[in-house]
Regions:
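Positively charged n-region of N-terminal signal peptides that target proteins for export
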Residues: 1-5
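Residues in and immediately flanking transmembrane alpha helices
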Residues: 16-17, 56, 282
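Sec/Tat signal peptide C-region and signal peptidase I cleavage site
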Residues: 18-22
């Protein structure tokens, strides 16, 4: 379901009460090859103050690295980036006309409940409405992008003059949504509304975040298996386009980085590191040694 899209693309959020001292969180791997080493860490993109400080093994690995690789660097978004997002996110009359009739009233109610203008439904593409609605829902729960783990690591790296590189671009990430057939976009939005209305989406956020916050390998692996076995369209889209199709190019870039530099660190969304088509699995397939630390 699209609630899984929420988890993957908007960062595996949920409710959490955590102690304010460093503990193991997420998923951590050590990758060796080409005579070099890389630390690979699973993150979430919006966070709470309770997520910090990070485990000392993470901060030490970053301090020892010459480069930090992220999906994108969230600290350097520009006005040009915002303009590009606006250009690609605006809808067309044909897309609006394809909205399922029953979806319109539900979408209007949700927008109004959030204090957003109902006119957004005829201004933004379905996938951008999905992002907007879910981001606002997470914000209501206290989650903030400036407290995302990626942003935290990027700030630390910049402060220590460690090079930060992006494995992807904002444009490429938005393109994953924008290339979806219009009917699929409306289906994803429909399922997102249903999961938020029922509370199921929020519960799944909690499950993923608890797994991340406790570095609960069994729970995270169980979630990955659950998503992989779900036959619904949105889960298939998630597995194919938002994970598998991205993981291949990212694995190639990480392999190249490992070959070039002695000590590096990569931090990407948690869901990229679990499941059968995960980055660790792809890196192993390249002949690299991949060890799970936790």
């Amino acid at each position: 379901m699209a609630r899984r899209m929420i988890v993957t693309l908007l960062a595996a959020f949920g409710l959490l009460a955590s102690p304010a001292w460093a503990v193991e969180r997420g998923a951590l791997f050590k990758v060796s090859g080409h005579g070099h080493t890389m630390v690979l860490f699973g993150t979430i993109h919006m966070g709470l103050p309770e997520f910090f400080p990070l485990d000392e093994s993470i901060t030490k690995a970053l301090a020892a690295s010459t480069t930090l690789a992220l999906e994108i660097d969230p600290t350097v978004q520009t006005a040009e980036t915002a303009a590009a997002v606006q250009r690609v996110a605006l809808t067309t009359p044909a897309i609006v006309a394809a909205m399922p009739p029953a979806l319109g009233p539900r979408l209007t109610r949700r927008l109004e409940a959030l204090g957003a203008p109902a006119a957004l439904s005829s201004q933004l593409k379905p996938w951008m409405l999905l992002i907007t609605l879910t981001t606002v829902e997470y914000a209501k729960l206290g989650y903030r992008p400036d407290l995302g783990v990626d942003a935290h690591l990027a700030k630390l790296a910049h402060g220590r003059h460690i090079k930060v590189i992006g494995l992807e671009t904002v444009e490429s990430q938005l393109g994953l949504f924008d290339r979806l057939p219009v009917a699929d976009q409306w289906t994803l939005l429909d399922e997102t509304l249903a999961s938020l209305d029922s509370g199921e989406g929020q519960q799944e956020m909690r499950s993923v975040t608890r797994g991340w916050a406790r570095a609960d390998r069994a729970a995270l692996d169980a979630l990955a298996l659950k998503y992989e076995k779900d036959p619904r369209l949105s889960s298939q889209i998630l597995q194919r386009r938002f994970l598998a199709e991205r993981n291949g190019p990212m694995a190639d870039k990480l392999d190249g980085l490992l070959a070039r530099e002695h000590h590096t660190m990569a931090a990407v969304g948690l869901m990229h590191l679990i499941g059968k088509d995960s980055l660790p699995a792809l890196l192993r397939a390249k002949g690299l040694k991949v060890e799970r630390v936790y």
